Amino acid sequence: MLNWDLQKNNDKITLFLFGELSRSTLLPMWQQRGVFLSASTLDKTIVEWNLSDLQHIDSAGFAALCDFLRECQKLNKTVRLVYPPKQLLTLADLFGLSDWIANFI
């Protein structure tokens, strides 16, 4: 199961992911991406992705997260990954994206 929440504070928006970001849980979040990736929602300078409660991420979840990060960059936001799980870093290394992901940590 995957849940998400959004919190706005001063100049920062924090997106919290809870549970499992995987092929089997990704579809509902992917369908709702317009809600949390729209320019009107991301009206702050800094966008943080808090992954402290992310229990599992697979390659499909990693690909989706990379797409979400790229979309935030397109909106000229400062993007940060907070508490990235070891699985995410392992997947980044596996796909040759360690340096790219490191820009967000």
Swiss-Prot record:
It is found in: Cytoplasm. Pfam families: STAS (PF01740). Keywords: Cytoplasm, Transport. Residues 4-105 form the STAS domain. The keyword Repeat does not apply. One of its GO terms (biological process) is intermembrane phospholipid transfer. One of its GO terms (molecular function) is phospholipid transfer activity. GO terms for cellular component: cytoplasm; phospholipid-translocating ATPase complex. Its main location: cytoplasm. The complex is composed of two ATP-binding proteins (MlaF), two transmembrane proteins (MlaE), two cytoplasmic solute-binding proteins (MlaB) and six periplasmic solute-binding proteins (MlaD). PANTHER family: BLR2341 PROTEIN, INTERMEMBRANE PHOSPHOLIPID TRANSPORT SYSTEM BINDING PROTEIN MLAB. Part of the ABC transporter complex MlaFEDB, which is involved in a phospholipid transport pathway that maintains lipid asymmetry in the outer membrane by retrograde trafficking of phospholipids from the outer membrane to the inner membrane. MlaB plays critical roles in both the assembly and activity of the complex. May act by modulating MlaF structure and stability. This is Intermembrane phospholipid transport system binding protein MlaB.
